[in-house]
């Protein structure tokens, strides 16, 4: 695709096009990182301060630049086409979608698929090999069910969903529209509910269900448990990485983002727009307010008010944690000073 066509796409997109130079209007057929890009490939630069050598050595035919990246004269001398935008990551995503179009799956049901009684399948559905769909389940239009997916009874799957190979959707789960469930994820598995008795652990039946809003994405090997009663809810637009555990009865708001190995204990409530970095733990029935950001390995055991940035274990305001972390390595010397002071009293 000619670079000029990509400029038209960016001009109609969300990246905020500022300026561009077509140079020789190169043909762009793929994308790569700056240091590995070759002829007819495109890359992007958010910050040029640490990429001096890569910029000088790149063979890319075109570059997407952040608005503060001032290297256009150098690129002109190298005959490299460029475009400056407010958000180069969005621009890169828009171009990747254009030059790497999504595979189109034909409307079909593989002969090895097993489909139960009273299953309602919408229009333009693709169902791959060895899929198992139990009775009374509904699948919305334009959905893609890859090989090996297991869908239990009484599940509702909205329109335009994609369920990747070997994921499992348990009974009574409800998926909105435009959701993506990646391989080996499990939606609606039994919550971890046991009651201690004199004879050991008594299992609490888990009769609730999981509800996913629209545009939710669940990463590979992540699990979302159903509760004993009621619902586990993940709000619209929320994105969950691989290897994340969402406990029974958890309520997650809209447009949250959770990185790998986050664990959320049963009954916790997460507001809208919350960001949980890798390995964050949220305790049982804890409330995390909207737009909270929790840094990696943060342990949240008490309620967090909205709009806070927290770090550490247990979680404290990030600025306080940074001061504590800066002083941590000084503790042995401080202990010696305190010991001397105590001895002199």
Swiss-Prot record:
GO biological process: lipid A biosynthetic process
EC number: 2.3.1.191
MF terms in GO: N-acyltransferase activity; structural constituent of carboxysome shell
Entry-linked Gene3D superfamilies: Hexapeptide repeat proteins, MurE/MurF, N-terminal domain
Active site, renumbered: 248
CDD domains: LbH_LpxD (cd03352)
Domain of life per record: Bacteria
Pathway named in the protein's UniProt entry: Bacterial outer membrane biogenesis; LPS lipid A biosynthesis
Pfam family membership, one: Hexapep
SUPFAM superfamilies: Trimeric LpxA-like enzymes (SSF51161)
Catalytic activity: a UDP-3-O-[(3R)-3-hydroxyacyl]-alpha-D-glucosamine + a (3R)-hydroxyacyl-[ACP] = a UDP-2-N,3-O-bis[(3R)-3-hydroxyacyl]-alpha-D-glucosamine + holo-[ACP] + H(+)
Keyword terms of this UniProt record: Acyltransferase, Lipid A biosynthesis, Lipid biosynthesis, Lipid metabolism, Repeat, Transferase
Subunit annotation: Homotrimer.
Family per similarity comment: Belongs to the transferase hexapeptide repeat family. LpxD subfamily.
Name this polypeptide is given: UDP-3-O-acylglucosamine N-acyltransferase
Annotated gene: lpxD
């Amino acid at each position: 695709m000619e670079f000029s066509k990509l400029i038209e796409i960016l001009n109609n997109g969300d990246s905020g096009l500022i300026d561009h130079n077509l140079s020789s209007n190169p043909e762009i057929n793929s994308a790569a990182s700056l240091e590995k890009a070759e002829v007819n490939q495109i890359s992007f630069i958010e910050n040029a301060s640490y990429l001096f050598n890569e910029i000088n050595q790149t063979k890319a035919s075109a570059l997407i630049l952040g608005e503060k990246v001032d290297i256009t004269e150098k690129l002109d001398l190298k005959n490299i086409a460029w475009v400056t935008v407010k958000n180069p990551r969005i621009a890169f995503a828009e171009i990747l979608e254009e030059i790497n179009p999504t595979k189109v799956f034909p409307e079909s049901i593989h002969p090895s698929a097993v489909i139960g009684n009273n299953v309602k399948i919408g229009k333009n559905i693709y169902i791959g090999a060895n899929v198992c769909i139990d009775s009374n389940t509904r699948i919305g239009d334009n959905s893609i069910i890859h090989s090996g997916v297991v869908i239990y009874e009484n599940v509702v799957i909205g329109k335009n969903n994609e369920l990747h190979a070997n994921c499992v959707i348990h009974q009574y789960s409800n998926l909105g529209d435009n959701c993506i469930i990646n391989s080996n994820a499990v939606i609606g598995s039994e919550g971890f509910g046991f009651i201690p008795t004199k004879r050991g652990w008594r299992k609490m039946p888990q009769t609730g269900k999981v509800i996913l809003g629209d545009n939710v994405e669940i990463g590979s090997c992540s699990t979302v448990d159903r509760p004993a009663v009621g619902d586990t809810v993940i709000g619209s637009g929320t994105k969950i990485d691989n290897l994340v555990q969402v406990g029974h009865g958890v309520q997650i708001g809209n447009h949250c983002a959770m990185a790998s190995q986050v664990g959320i204990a049963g009954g916790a409530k997460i507001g809208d727009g919350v960001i949980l970095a890798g390995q964050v733990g949220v305790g049982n029935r804890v409330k995390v307010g909207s737009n909270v950001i929790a840094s990696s390995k943060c342990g949240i055991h008490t309620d967090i008010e909205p709009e806070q940035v927290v770090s550490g274990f247990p979680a404290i305001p990030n600025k306080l944690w940074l001061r504590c972390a800066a002083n941590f390595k000084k503790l042995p010397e401080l202990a010696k000073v305190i010991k001397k002071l105590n001895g002199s009293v």
